Regions:
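Catalytic micro-motifs at enzyme active sites that drive phosphoryl/nucleotidyl and oxygen chemistry
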Residues: 74-79, 93-97, 125-126
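Short, flexible loop/turn motifs enriched in small residues
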Residues: 98-104
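Two-metal-ion RNase H-like nuclease active-site motif
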Residues: 84-94
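Short gly/ser/thr-rich secondary-structure transition/capping motifs
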Residues: 69-72, 89, 117-119
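Conserved DEDDh/DEDDy metal-dependent 3′-5′ exonuclease domain
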Residues: 105-198
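Long, charge-rich alpha-helical interaction segments
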Residues: 190-214
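N-terminal accessory regions of nucleic-acid-interacting proteins
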Residues: 1-82
Length: 214
């Protein structure tokens, strides 16, 4: 999917990308100097430049470039190319304010196994282990998990980030993580405790409407 993507390139929005597909330009390799596409000379130059840069970063196995350039609700597009270096991440805390509260538990799933980091046991091991991955996947991590982790450990997480909150919101799913799970038919039984009920003790708040560009 990534090589069919143009929306991350300067001057290319969703409507223009759709027009490019309809004109026959469906992936990077189909672009040529004499291709007939609905763009001015300047925008065609920017498209060519963007494709060249994209090829370079994909060759260098660098998902951060695409994470920064793609709208948050389109970050799923680089998932297939980097799926072998992804950490699915969730944290639980003593409260909602990262300046006053602490992380009690971090759960990390890499597609094969789950690693749990617990305060007072092995929580500090997370700092080294997370560096093994090029992409982090969260729900509401842009607003909560990532800033909380960075402040708590005094580190900077430089990985590419896919926040499912923005992707799900763009698809019409509302009501925070638990609400999305219910709408998708996912039932975790007694584990499915509403986020607001747990916020005062150990878990992140239930997230609603995103507040960044999607």
């Amino acid at each position: 999917m990534l090589q069919n993507t143009f929306i991350h390139i300067q001057s290319i929005g969703a409507i223009t990308e759709q027009r490019l597909w309809e004109s026959g330009l469906r992936d990077w390799d189909e672009f040529t100097d004499d291709i007939s596409i609905p763009l001015s000379g300047r925008r065609k130059y920017l498209l060519q430049k963007g494709i060249d840069e994209s090829r370079q970063h994909l060759y260098q196995n660098n998902p951060v470039y695409f994470s920064k350039c793609l709208p948050a609700n389109q970050s799923w597009r680089f998932f297939p190319e980097f799926r072998n270096s992804i950490a699915y991440l969730d944290i639980e805390t003593t409260g909602l304010d990262r300046h006053y509260h602490s992380i009690t538990t971090i759960a990390l799933y890499d597609g094969e196994s789950v690693q749990t980091y617990v305060q007072g046991q092995n929580l500090e091991d997370f700092i080294e282990d997370i560096q093994k991955y090029k992409v982090i996947v969260t729900y509401n991590g842009k607003s909560f998990d990532i800033p909380f982790i960075e402040h708590f450990f005094n580190i900077k997480l430089g990985q590419a980030h896919i926040d499912l909150r923005y992707i799900l919101y763009s698809l019409g799913f509302r009501g925070g993580l638990k609400g999305c799970e219910r709408q998708l038919g996912m039932d975790r039984g007694d584990l499915s405790v509403d986020g607001h009920a747990k916020a005062s003790t150990t878990e992140k708040p239930d997230a609603g409407k995103p507040h960044v560009r999607v």
